């Protein structure tokens, strides 16, 4: 599985004339290697063959002192980390060459690997030669990095490897992750099912006098009891006037009769995130509140019916946004309609006016329109949806009709 993902990454990088890729975010480390530990750097040299080569027989005792061994020149896939994770790498990533950090930082090890790979690199990537067949110091690699790379690491790499160019290549790195395989879809569906169960559970808990913090904690405890490892983001419980803030912080405000309460929450199950939002009423809502709720629900449903393979993301956003505007509330829907979900809670692509990515089958994206009337109340309804060839599959199954408690 991980080798197949690296093959796709390798092909994406070849098409963009990159000679190597360096990753350090936990989600990308896991996606491309299976490593679930902490600090590490993944370095892969791009190969014109289908599969970048690695020789794990050299894992034992490999450090900066012997990193110039001849055999390193033919390896193309490395994971650099310290002694806290040696055993973990060997168990989780048996097909990756482990570089054991000891007395130097990541940038020094990357520098050595780049220098030692030069001879082999010339043959497969002649375009990387800056000056006709000169020594290795005259070579420059174009190395793809994430847009989330820590600035300190980026500066250290740039200083240690001045003859190389580190280029943000978000599209090449994230393209594979946008399309989920069957195992990923099943895991995300299970994570979302935990969220659905949490919503059903929390309804019996909600009544006047209970605080937003009480509700948020109960949701978290319930999801963890159902097998979630952690929250996928800080739970939002926004009641009364707080619900007009899309990302309100949880407070000790007590629920009151006449409140709308918006709950946006999710969990991580076996590494993958869920995300859902529901708005409920405490006591009988006003006519205006019911009207706004129905507009948001209709926008959610209209957008969902537009979801299918081959549609631009901004066109789907426009369906919901245009409908809300036609009902007179266009100024009160300020955020994008949705975002990708997977190993991270916010992934590509996005349902937003700026995103012209064309949807592909098995993308997992949220559909979450909202209307927010400052200082009064707000409504958001969010489902998690899988893009299909001729439509969609909804992973969120909680009731979306207005629930009055």
Region spans (language model):
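Active-site neighborhoods and metal-handling regions in enzymes and metal-associated proteins
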Residues: 1-405
């Amino acid at each position: 599985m991980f080798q197949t993902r690296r093959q796709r990454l390798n092909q994406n990088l070849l098409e963009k004339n990159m000679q190597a890729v360096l990753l350090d975010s936990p989600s990308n480390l896991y996606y491309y290697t299976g490593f679930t530990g902490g600090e590490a750097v993944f370095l892969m040299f791009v190969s014109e063959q289908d599969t970048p080569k690695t020789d794990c027989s050299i894992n034992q005792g490999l450090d900066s002192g012997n990193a110039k061994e001849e055999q390193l020149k033919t390896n193309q896939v490395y994971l650099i980390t310290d002694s806290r994770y040696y055993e973990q790498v060997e168990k989780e990533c048996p097909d990756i060459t482990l570089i054991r950090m000891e007395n130097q930082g990541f940038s020094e090890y990357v520098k050595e690997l780049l220098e030692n790979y030069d001879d082999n690199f010339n043959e497969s990537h002649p375009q990387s030669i800056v000056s006709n067949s000169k020594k290795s110091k005259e070579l420059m690699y174009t190395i793809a990095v994430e847009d989330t790379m820590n600035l300190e690491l980026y500066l250290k790499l740039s200083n240690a490897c001045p003859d190389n160019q580190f280029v943000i290549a978000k599209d090449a790195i994230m393209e594979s992750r946008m399309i989920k395989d069957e195992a990923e879809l099943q895991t995300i569906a299970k994570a979302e099912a935990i969220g659905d169960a949490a919503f059903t559970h929390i309804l019996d808990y909600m009544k006047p006098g209970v605080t937003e913090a009480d509700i948020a904690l109960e949701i978290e405890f319930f999801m963890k009891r159902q097998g979630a490892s952690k929250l996928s983001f800080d739970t939002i419980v926004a009641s009364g006037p707080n619900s007009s803030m899309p990302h309100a912080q949880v407070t000790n405000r007590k629920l009151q009769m006449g409140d709308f309460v918006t709950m946006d929450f999710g969990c991580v199950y076996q590494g993958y995130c869920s995300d859902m939002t529901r708005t409920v009423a405490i006591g009988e809502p006003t006519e205006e509140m019911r009207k706004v709720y129905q507009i948001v629900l209709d926008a959610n449903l209209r957008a969902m019916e537009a979801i299918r393979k081959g549609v631009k993301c901004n066109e789907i956003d426009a369906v919901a946004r245009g409908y809300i505007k036609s009902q007179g509330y266009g100024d009160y829907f300020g955020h994008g309609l949705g975002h990708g979900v997977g190993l991270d809670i916010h992934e590509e692509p996005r349902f937003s006016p700026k995103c012209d990515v064309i949807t592909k089958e098995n993308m997992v994206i949220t559909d979450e329109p909202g209307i927010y009337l400052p200082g009064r109340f707000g409504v958001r309804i969010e489902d998690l949806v899988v893009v299909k060839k001729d439509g969609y599959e909804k992973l969120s199954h909680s009731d979306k009709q207005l629930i009055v408690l």
